[in-house]
Amino acid sequence: MSMEFFAWPWADGFFGADARKFRYSHLAGALTFIPYGTMVDHFQHIVYEHPELTPAQRHEEWKKLAAIYQPWMRLDGEIPFYGAGEYWQRQMHIYQSPFYYIDYCLAQTVSLQFWAMLQKDRADAWSHYMAYTKQGGSRTFTELLKNAGLTTPFEESCLRGVSEAAKAWLDSYDLTGIL
């Protein structure tokens, strides 16, 4: 996920006239993924704690969570599958790799830290990235972050900081000609 942000300078060569649209969409998608990924894990906790829930009750639980984690989503029946709270079923990780989405959320939060660094100093961001990746599997996740000068996603200030930076960038982005 982090390398996707490091590749932004080459987006023009790949996407051509749509590179600006890609950058906006990529950052917005990275930011909005975190609540979705969190919702997936929250839903699994409910289902595992209450295996007696009927399919209809599980759909209702998903709808409740969607209202909390994705309040911007319109689930008013345009697509019945989504409006009925059934769209958790399209998330194969729930069946194949339960509780895996937390990994994606953590990785995305770290990638947003790199994105924020890239906005200030690309060379410095790269040196932090190399410090992070060179350690490989030799340390715990939080040790990897600390040794590379990054903040753990478990700190509220981390998510708040990257979210505010991304929101400011998205709010100021010139959308002329790309919507």
List the model feature ranges, each with a label.
Residues 2-13, 17, 33, 37, ...:
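C-terminal, non-catalytic "cap/extension" segments appended to globular domains
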Residues 22-29, 91:
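Short beta-alpha connecting loops at secondary-structure transitions
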